[in-house]
């Protein structure tokens, strides 16, 4: 099965960008509570 590299990158970005965004918000919230 041939993998479309552009589709793979687009999917990776679509998953990683919101995940990293939520992770940054979580870290900021935790650091503010302490």
Swiss-Prot record:
TM region(s), chain numbering: 5-25
Top-level taxon in the UniProt lineage: Eukaryota
GO cellular component terms attached to this protein's record: chloroplast thylakoid membrane; photosystem II
Plastid among keywords: yes
Pfam families, sorted: PsbM
Topological category with respect to the lipid bilayer: Single-pass membrane protein
Subcellular location field: Plastid, Chloroplast thylakoid membrane
Principal subcellular localisation of the protein: plastid
Biological processes, Gene Ontology terms: photosynthesis, light reaction
Alphabetically ordered keywords of this record: Chloroplast, Membrane, Photosynthesis, Photosystem II, Plastid, Reaction center, Thylakoid, Transmembrane, Transmembrane helix
Keyword Chloroplast belongs to the record: yes
Protein's job: One of the components of the core complex of photosystem II (PSII). PSII is a light-driven water:plastoquinone oxidoreductase that uses light energy to abstract electrons from H(2)O, generating O(2) and a proton gradient subsequently used for ATP formation. It consists of a core antenna complex that captures photons, and an electron transfer chain that converts photonic excitation into a charge separation. This subunit is found at the monomer-monomer interface.
Record note on quaternary structure: PSII is composed of 1 copy each of membrane proteins PsbA, PsbB, PsbC, PsbD, PsbE, PsbF, PsbH, PsbI, PsbJ, PsbK, PsbL, PsbM, PsbT, PsbX, PsbY, PsbZ, Psb30/Ycf12, at least 3 peripheral proteins of the oxygen-evolving complex and a large number of cofactors. It forms dimeric complexes. Detected in both etioplasts and green leaves; PSII is only assembled in green leaves.
Family affiliation: Belongs to the PsbM family.
Entries under PANTHER family matching the protein: PHOTOSYSTEM II REACTION CENTER PROTEIN M
Protein name: Photosystem II reaction center protein M
Organism of provenance: Hordeum vulgare (Barley)
Lineage, highest ranks first: Eukaryota, Viridiplantae, Streptophyta, Embryophyta, Tracheophyta
């Amino acid at each position: 099965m041939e993998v479309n590299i552009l589709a793979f990158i687009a999917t990776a970005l679509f998953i990683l960008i919101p995940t990293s965004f939520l992770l940054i918000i979580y870290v900021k919230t935790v650091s503010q509570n302490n």
